[in-house]
Amino acid sequence: MTIHQLSPESQWKIVSSSFIYGPVAAVRELLDNSIDSGAKKVFIDVDSTTGGCEYISVKDDGSGVDIIDRPSMCLEYTTSKMSSLGDISILTTLGFRGEALFLLSNLCNQKGSMQVETKTADDVIGEKWLVDSKGGITNGKRYKVSCPVGTTVILRKLLGGLRARYLEISSRPRKTFDELIYLINHYSLIHRNIRFYFSLVSLQKNGAIERKQMQETLDPKISRARSLSLLARLKKPVPLNFIVEENFVIDEKINLDLILPRMVPESDVINIKRRFKFLSVNERALSLNLETGKTISKLLSSIYRDFSLLDPMVWFINLNCDTKLLDVNIEPEKNDVMIKSFEVIFKKIENKLKLLLEERIGIETNMLGDKHVQPSINEKTSPALVIPTPDAENEISKGCGAVSGKDKTDIPQKNSDLIVPTFYDEANLENTTIVAATPSPTKFSEDKALDEQTQLTISSYRSSSSGSMASEDSTNWRHNFQQELSENSEVAGAGSSTLPSSLTYNYIETIPENEDLELSKDASISNPFMITKIRNVNKKLSENLLEAKRTSCGDANKRGMPNERQLSNTEKKELIKLQQTYGKRNNTVDMTIPRNSKKKVTDNYIKKASCMHKTRPKLMHFSEYTNNYVYTLKNEKIVKHDSDNFAKETLWLRSRDDATSPSSSLLQALRAHVKKPGHIEATTNEWCLFTPDSP
């Protein structure tokens, strides 16, 4: 195969496709130009269907492009940021090659187009034009357009000439959106004086924008640490989550702007699983997948592991160093740098970060009472409390009882509540077992009575502990299931007849009286003996609770209602008779009460009605869900009865139910013949008056 030269068109297609992989790289190049132009607001619009393969627009409010520079704006190897290779060592801008716009125009013109719109502060009106595949103005035509000061670049069908890449990237727009959001957030954290707006747009068939929806933006008025907290959606204050340092000096040529997480349990940054890691050098965003970013990310994780902390997932580091120590021209996307004497600088950064974390997190853990705080080097002893055994106390008390009364006065009285720490050597404590015990009651001589305070103290000691292990003074000790099983059981196969089992003759099940039994961490829940014991305890507890509920209900019934009035036997009989008399309807007569006594009973009931009905209605509720509490619902409205109205009603009832009453019989006969609606009223003379209703 002979060697031949590629055509210029094929050359630039190959170069441009290798430099501009997709929409993310194209947006990055346009953002660099907007930042270099001094913009304060940058708007990024991407089509929502293909993730930028069909439409990308980057608009800024920078200085714009002068009229004399517009024809050469997109030509290859044209730039306003440097004039020779030596200027790279003193470079302060993000762009410097002069080929990004040319490569973008070459890619877009294969199937689409590239449009530029700009205006400077000195221009009366702006201009727009299309860029051809060689970076020049298409047909040399520029059009006047009304636009604000700044520059807008619109890319259409960026990957139209690369079919395979277009299908691959356009089929996963969600991944492209995530990468763009990460890139824009990275730039927002680095350049806090610029506000970036990221939006998704929908296109019509003719390419016009149909709908636009903003997705991401960060207010530049808030601090960088607060912005990072918003990105990670942290709720707690920034000082509790982050360590913030500005111009953290490493040496005379390097300093850091950093935000490191406090990976302590009190912060909520410890729960973040998604990565929010941002690294930059001289405000140039770096990728964590390349050499420099990967090395610093691993360094930070190793430092946190040395402090027994989780790997940090949210942090920001901007390394400011002399430009003469950097080489930024090592990657096509300019997202990696080479640092001179990187190993030495790397070691300095590691030592400084360790000191910073030790100072900040170490002070915090000490304030929070962290158990990992190491004691001082000179401290060789540790305090221990000396608790006398019961036998030792008895010996002391016996000795005190043998002393005469004269000698007792010479002995100073010591405060029994005072605990004096005794220091032991740590080497001697290795084989020492510390047992916390409840002190037994102290014995006193017969001629000395216990004062009230001592009696209260001893009684409180006895009531504070509970359990099933009894000591000499009948004091129960707190224990767990595992300890009780180990004491009451024997080795399997030993043939002991005292083995606590349900198969034992005359076996009586014993249920522990302690309701505060704890399950040991070493106990196995799958053990059938353990399950049986737990069920027995739960059964006993449920029985006790049921008994307590019954007792509380019984007490409530015994107490009764405080507002209830107790009636005498005579009143109860009269009330029952009255209810039987007036409880029946349909002109039936109660034969249990003589007719001549009805009026007398009614009059007595009228006299007693006012006092009998002054009690307030009350309803008592009890349920197993009320936790043994009985609550009462009261009706505060007192029922008031008018004796006159009540007398009229009873008179009418008596007249209606009495078949022998002439007035009642007459009215019943009249109502059958008079076919008019009316009403019946009782007069004061015990007559009934029928009045027809007026038509």
UniProtKB/Swiss-Prot annotation:
Misc. remarks from the entry: Present with 72 molecules/cell in log phase SD medium.
Main location: nucleus
Subcellular location: Nucleus
Gene Ontology molecular functions: ATP binding; ATP hydrolysis activity; ATP-dependent DNA damage sensor activity; mismatched DNA binding
Subunit text: Heterodimer of MLH1 and MLH2.
Biological process per Gene Ontology, one example term: reciprocal meiotic recombination
The organism's taxonomic lineage, starting at the top: Eukaryota, Fungi, Dikarya, Ascomycota, Saccharomycotina
Keywords of this entry: DNA damage, DNA repair, Nucleus
Transmembrane segments: none
Gene3D superfamilies: 3.30.230.10, Histidine kinase-like ATPase, C-terminal domain
Pfam family, one: DNA_mis_repair
Protein name: DNA mismatch repair protein MLH2
Described function: Involved in DNA mismatch repair (MMR), correcting insertion-deletion loops (IDLs) resulting from DNA replication, DNA damage or from recombination events between non-identical sequences during meiosis. Component of a MutL heterodimer with MLH1, which probably forms a ternary complex with the MutSbeta heterodimer that initially recognizes the DNA mismatches. This complex is thought to be responsible for directing the downstream MMR events, including strand discrimination, excision, and resynthesis.
InterPro entries, alphabetized: DNA_mismatch_repair_CS (IPR014762), DNA_mismatch_S5_2-like (IPR013507), HATPase_C_sf (IPR036890), MutL/Mlh/PMS (IPR002099), MutL/Mlh/Pms-like (IPR038973), Ribosomal_Su5_D2-typ_SF (IPR020568), Ribsml_uS5_D2-typ_fold_subgr (IPR014721)
A GO-annotated cellular component: MutLbeta complex
PANTHER family for the chain: DNA MISMATCH REPAIR PROTEIN MLH, PMS, MUTL, DNA MISMATCH REPAIR PROTEIN MLH2
Family: Belongs to the DNA mismatch repair MutL/HexB family.
